[in-house]
A protein has these predicted regions:
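C-terminal binding/interaction regions
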Residues: 2-14, 20-23, 27-28, 33-127
Length: 127
Protein backbone atom coordinates (compact mmCIF):
# COMPACT_ATOMS: atom_id res chain seq x y z
CA UNK A 1 0.00 0.00 0.00
CA UNK A 2 1.38 3.42 -0.97
CA UNK A 3 -0.23 5.53 1.72
CA UNK A 4 1.13 8.78 0.27
CA UNK A 5 -1.09 8.35 -2.78
CA UNK A 6 -4.08 7.15 -0.76
CA UNK A 7 -4.19 10.20 1.50
CA UNK A 8 -6.83 12.86 0.82
CA UNK A 9 -5.24 16.21 0.09
CA UNK A 10 -7.21 19.45 -0.18
CA UNK A 11 -7.75 21.38 -3.42
CA UNK A 12 -4.26 22.89 -3.04
CA UNK A 13 -2.65 19.47 -2.67
CA UNK A 14 -2.13 19.94 1.08
CA UNK A 15 -2.88 17.89 4.17
CA UNK A 16 -2.69 19.08 7.80
CA UNK A 17 -0.13 17.51 10.10
CA UNK A 18 -0.51 17.54 13.88
CA UNK A 19 2.88 17.17 15.54
CA UNK A 20 3.21 15.74 19.05
CA UNK A 21 6.19 15.34 21.32
CA UNK A 22 7.13 11.67 21.49
CA UNK A 23 6.69 10.27 24.97
CA UNK A 24 4.41 13.02 26.32
CA UNK A 25 1.83 13.44 23.56
CA UNK A 26 2.06 17.21 23.96
CA UNK A 27 1.00 19.02 20.78
CA UNK A 28 3.94 21.03 19.49
CA UNK A 29 2.49 22.44 16.30
CA UNK A 30 0.14 22.01 13.37
CA UNK A 31 1.53 22.52 9.87
CA UNK A 32 0.80 21.65 6.26
CA UNK A 33 2.37 19.03 4.04
CA UNK A 34 2.12 18.08 0.39
CA UNK A 35 3.22 14.86 -1.30
CA UNK A 36 6.74 16.15 -1.87
CA UNK A 37 7.25 17.19 1.77
CA UNK A 38 5.81 13.89 2.97
CA UNK A 39 8.17 11.89 0.73
CA UNK A 40 11.12 13.97 1.99
CA UNK A 41 10.02 13.55 5.62
CA UNK A 42 9.87 9.77 5.30
CA UNK A 43 13.23 9.63 3.48
CA UNK A 44 15.04 12.00 5.86
CA UNK A 45 13.43 10.88 9.12
CA UNK A 46 12.92 14.53 10.06
CA UNK A 47 9.91 16.75 9.49
CA UNK A 48 9.67 18.63 6.19
CA UNK A 49 6.67 20.88 5.59
CA UNK A 50 5.04 23.04 2.94
CA UNK A 51 5.01 26.75 3.77
CA UNK A 52 1.75 28.26 2.57
CA UNK A 53 3.07 31.81 3.00
CA UNK A 54 6.40 31.27 1.22
CA UNK A 55 5.00 28.63 -1.13
CA UNK A 56 7.99 26.36 -0.69
CA UNK A 57 9.20 23.22 1.07
CA UNK A 58 10.93 23.80 4.41
CA UNK A 59 12.92 21.40 6.52
CA UNK A 60 12.02 22.10 10.15
CA UNK A 61 15.22 23.14 11.88
CA UNK A 62 17.11 23.78 8.64
CA UNK A 63 17.89 27.34 9.77
CA UNK A 64 17.54 27.10 13.55
CA UNK A 65 18.81 23.58 14.21
CA UNK A 66 15.50 22.87 15.97
CA UNK A 67 14.81 19.67 14.08
CA UNK A 68 12.00 17.19 14.61
CA UNK A 69 13.06 13.54 14.38
CA UNK A 70 10.15 11.34 13.34
CA UNK A 71 9.30 8.47 15.68
CA UNK A 72 5.85 7.61 14.31
CA UNK A 73 3.38 8.67 11.64
CA UNK A 74 -0.36 7.94 11.78
CA UNK A 75 -3.36 9.11 9.79
CA UNK A 76 -7.02 9.49 10.68
CA UNK A 77 -9.96 7.36 9.56
CA UNK A 78 -10.78 9.72 6.66
CA UNK A 79 -7.13 9.80 5.56
CA UNK A 80 -7.25 13.61 5.48
CA UNK A 81 -5.09 14.45 8.52
CA UNK A 82 -1.68 13.24 9.68
CA UNK A 83 -0.36 12.76 13.21
CA UNK A 84 3.38 12.65 13.84
CA UNK A 85 5.24 11.77 17.02
CA UNK A 86 8.63 13.51 17.05
CA UNK A 87 11.67 14.12 19.19
CA UNK A 88 11.96 17.91 19.21
CA UNK A 89 15.37 19.58 19.38
CA UNK A 90 14.94 23.04 20.91
CA UNK A 91 11.88 25.16 20.16
CA UNK A 92 9.15 23.99 17.80
CA UNK A 93 7.61 27.46 17.61
CA UNK A 94 9.11 30.26 15.51
CA UNK A 95 8.25 32.59 18.43
CA UNK A 96 10.88 30.73 20.46
CA UNK A 97 8.68 28.43 22.56
CA UNK A 98 8.77 24.64 22.86
CA UNK A 99 5.18 24.46 21.55
CA UNK A 100 3.23 26.76 19.26
CA UNK A 101 0.45 26.35 21.84
CA UNK A 102 2.23 28.41 24.50
CA UNK A 103 -0.80 30.58 25.33
CA UNK A 104 -4.00 29.63 27.14
CA UNK A 105 -7.20 31.48 27.88
CA UNK A 106 -7.86 31.31 31.63
CA UNK A 107 -10.97 33.07 32.97
CA UNK A 108 -11.07 35.22 29.85
CA UNK A 109 -7.43 36.28 30.10
CA UNK A 110 -4.65 35.18 27.76
CA UNK A 111 -1.71 33.74 29.67
CA UNK A 112 1.69 32.58 28.44
CA UNK A 113 2.02 29.08 29.87
CA UNK A 114 5.67 28.26 29.24
CA UNK A 115 9.04 29.99 29.13
CA UNK A 116 10.54 31.20 25.86
CA UNK A 117 13.50 28.96 25.00
CA UNK A 118 15.18 31.13 22.38
CA UNK A 119 15.09 34.68 21.08
CA UNK A 120 13.59 34.44 17.56
CA UNK A 121 15.52 37.52 16.41
CA UNK A 122 18.81 35.80 17.21
CA UNK A 123 17.74 32.52 15.61
CA UNK A 124 15.86 33.77 12.55
CA UNK A 125 16.89 37.42 12.34
CA UNK A 126 13.31 38.59 12.94
CA UNK A 127 11.39 40.41 15.62
Amino acid sequence: MNIIDELKYDSNGLIPAVVQEHGTGRVLMVAWMNKESLVKTLALGEMVYWSRSRKEIWHKGGTSGHTQKVKDMAFDCDKDCLLFQVVQAGAACHDGYKSCFYRSVVNGDVKVTEPRLVDPEKVYGKK
